[in-house]
Amino acid sequence: MGSYLNPGNEAFAVALNSEIYVDKTGLLTYTNKVMNTLQGYICNSRPRRFGKSITANMLTAYYSKGCSSKEMFSGLEISRAKDFEKHLNQYDVLHWDIQWCMEPAGGPERIVSYISEKTISELKEYYPHILPEGIRSLPEALSRINAASGTKFIVIIDEWDVLIRDEAADLKTQEEYINFLRAMFKGTEPTKYIQLAYLTGILPVKKEKTQSALNNFKDYSMLHAGPIAPYVGFTETEVQKLCEVYGQKFEEVKRWYDGYQIGKYHVYNPNAVVNLMLEGEFQSYWSGTASYEAIVPLINMDFDGLKSAVIEMLSGDHVPVDVTSFQNDTVSFANKDDVLTYLIHLGYLAYDRTFRTAFIPNEEIRQELILATKRKKWNELIVFQKESEQLLKDTIQMNGNAVAKEIEKIHRKYTSVIQYNNENSLSSVLSIAYLSSMQYYFKPIREFPAGRGFADFVFIPKPEFQNYYPALVVELKWDKSVRAALDQIRDRKYPESVACYAGELLLVGINYNKKTKEHECRIEKIKR
């Protein structure tokens, strides 16, 4: 058992010994299926604290010849597979954590030589008569061993992208590292000695121009995870079971930590869910996982529409995004779509693959983004929030004229000329205008099923604020009148479906005159 060749199973044992362990060994069924095939080159990227290292340690514990793990995996999902014992501890495994290797290597520029030297040294102990003295190329060493003995290797690289993310300015180090990976995995010779390759990190494989630097790898990411989607985070079923055990309300857990849509799965942040179950408090557990310094410089980049897109998403809207141009690094940003795509990979945004839109997935992330912008003084958002807070105050005080003026101002500022006279744009403007309401209200519900129809917007106060803030039913009209809007709310009995959510209920009618581009607003109160 070595440090890098055939490690033991101690690291995975720590995960199994923890109070909460959610069984993800079903992934091994897939890796067993694709090993020694063209599909056996996997890059699985996901955000921090989404279980990347636990997965890498699980693969090592299952495949490595350096340990005996039958008892460890008994009772877990993989133990019920027909080929469970066929692959159990049967392979020579190379496992490197690039982040950890940085310190003993003496710096990023020494990573490739350090990994090569240490791994070759361990290979010589296992295969003493095959490797000649002075050999320095790890790919060559693996090739020689395969030629002499027929041995094939499973290679697992944790934090594979740390040099791409953290050493973006050091092009020489990056180039050396990418060339090392190419030599390890790409071409005819590596197919002879690679049984399975599994890379995990935050970013998918680096692109060069539009082509992946390792185009034989299959990228599974927060954009698309294919067959391994249920193993990216906690699934809804897994979270429901934890809620039953720990007595948590599932709907509240869903509001705080759900939102990542990967294939047919709703995926939850494992770190947040585990901390909630153990500590019992709904809050953001994200702060320790990423730096505020990384967020605001990204959204402050001078790209058309970037800042307004972020404000739209903070208000609950989805924004279109083209994820195809991102180069999978932290420097080659060409437009707002590249920035949004990077934020998706970081976990600050989620991606709707069907409609090709980005959005803020849940309450935890919304709070983190707002907190980050406050700490780093993103002035545009700070000013906008103050305006939004005044709008909410005017709404609650039933000052219809002030509300109309503020919505008109935002309508002009955040809607393009082409979209200005468009009912959908007015709906988006309303979401943006009431951004500050997110402190006290759930995300506004569009087309809320109520009475004999669907209310345009409903704002329901969070439980802790229901005695202080009224529920809001908002109806939008186009070239009609505010009276028509309020009459529709009453005639279709919308209030009856909403009144139970708060002590008071405000009916808000808003009309937009397409010809004059003026807005009107009237507000009425209903007491329960």
Question: Across the structure, where does each feature detected by a protein language model lie?
Answer:
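Catalytic centers of nucleases
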Residues: 444-464
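Domain-level recognition of nuclease-like catalytic cores that cleave nucleotide substrates
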Residues: 497, 501-528
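Extended hydrophobic-aromatic, low-complexity segments
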Residues: 352, 441-446, 465-471, 482-485, ...
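Phosphate-binding site recognition
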Residues: 1-422, 437-441, 445
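Mg2+/Mn2+-dependent nuclease catalytic core
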Residues: 174-180, 478-495
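Metal-dependent nuclease catalytic cores in nucleic-acid-processing enzymes
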Residues: 184-191, 341-349, 431-436, 488-508
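Conserved catalytic cores of phosphodiester-cleaving nucleases, focusing on short active-site segments
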Residues: 430, 455-461, 469-480, 492
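Structural motif
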Residues: 154, 470-474, 506
